[in-house]
């Protein structure tokens, strides 16, 4: 059966945002500021996946905090389990939760790798043939986050990129440390 055209209709766009940097650079605070504004504008709540157990600080008022001294209001899931995160975020009700924050995606990628229980190579690395099974649940979560109607903010650790010029490694850039 051939594909058919349907009348285009406006729909609410959902932000998909990545935020990365070194430890202590303000990723969690920035994510909460964005999430709070998005949730307030959309009339919903924030679902915050916390793999670092660092959001409790932001769930209380801190008068000394110059920017946003009052407590943030969000629902938290404390885990580093990729399976738990996938199950929890795919069961969220978009009518209630308008924003999902994953902090940190780096831990979830590491959990996917750590879940590998097969035999390692002679060099003590995961064999090439095993990577498909390792990546599948991680990619499934990422696909859901990209396709879901909710705003999504993903925090991750910074990874430095080096090139070796004349035997001397030189930093040439940074990326988010995830798959």
Feature map (PLM): residue ranges:
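Conserved P-loop
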Residues: 2-101, 106-111
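Phosphate-binding/switch region of NTP-binding enzymes
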Residues: 20-24, 143-179
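Short acidic/His/Gly/Ser-rich catalytic and metal-binding motifs that mark active-site loops
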Residues: 56-58, 108-118, 161-165
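Glycine-rich, phosphate-binding/catalytic loops in enzymes
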Residues: 65-66, 116-120, 170-171
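A short acidic, glycine-rich active-site loop
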Residues: 76, 123-139, 179
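Conserved P-loop NTPase nucleotide-binding/switch module
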Residues: 102-133
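The first long alpha-helix at the start of the GST-like C-terminal all-alpha domain
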Residues: 103, 141-142
């Amino acid at each position: 059966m051939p594909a058919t055209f349907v009348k285009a209709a406006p729909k609410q766009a959902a932000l998909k945002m990545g935020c990365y940097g070194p430890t202590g650079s303000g990723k969690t605070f920035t994510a909460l500021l964005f999430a709070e504004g998005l949730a307030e504008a959309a009339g919903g709540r924030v679902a915050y996946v916390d793999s670092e157990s660092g959001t409790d600080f932001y769930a209380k008022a801190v008068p000394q905090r110059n920017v946003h001294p009052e407590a943030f209001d969000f629902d938290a899931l404390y885990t580093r389990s990729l399976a738990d995160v996938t199950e929890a975020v795919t069961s969220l009700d978009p009518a209630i939760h308008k924003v999902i924050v994953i902090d940190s995606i780096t831990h979830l990628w590491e959990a996917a790798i750590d879940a590998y229980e097969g035999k390692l190579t002679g060099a003590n690395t995961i064999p090439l043939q095993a990577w498909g099974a390792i990546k599948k649940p991680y990619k499934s979560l990422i696909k859901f986050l990209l396709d879901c109607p909710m705003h999504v903010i993903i925090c991750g650790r910074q990874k430095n990129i080096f090139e070796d010029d004349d035997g001397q490694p030189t930093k040439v850039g940074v990326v988010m440390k995830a798959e």
